[in-house]
Amino acid sequence: FYIWIFRGTPLLVQLFVVFFGLSRVGVLLDPFPAAVIVFSLNEGAYCAETIRAALESVPKGQLEAGQCVGLTYLQTIFRIVLPQAMRTAFPPLSNSLISMVKDTSLAANITVTEMFMVTQRIVARTYEPLLLYLEVGLIYLIFSTVLTWVQRFGEKKLASYGHKEG
């Protein structure tokens, strides 16, 4: 139910429901904690599905093989199943992180002061929207590019995990 709700509704709607809706029932949150809660719940839903799919991608025989060589259930999970699942899950989890970084601009809609909101304030004073929004886009692009490089490095490390050269 949780995953269905958070994957099936727009992030902006989730921000509004938590920030404005909870105040209607007496739960008052400042904008920043409300945004942190929503981003955490939203990303958690996507990450849960990614990890579930990655775990299901590991053949059942791997679990049986680990137990046949004398490993306990937990040893089999941590030494055999999870390393394989993480190789599968790492790229989509990294992509989710990159998307979340870009989605933080939505928090301006509940008055969280972040880069996009600051830019809107400057635009209101200078009447120079194009250049300023291009600069914000460039900053997001640079940050996303760095995260992509980190992702590729992590993928290479995970791909070589367990493969000893000899």
Task: List where the protein language model places each region.
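Transmembrane alpha-helices and adjacent helix-loop boundaries
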Residues: 1-166
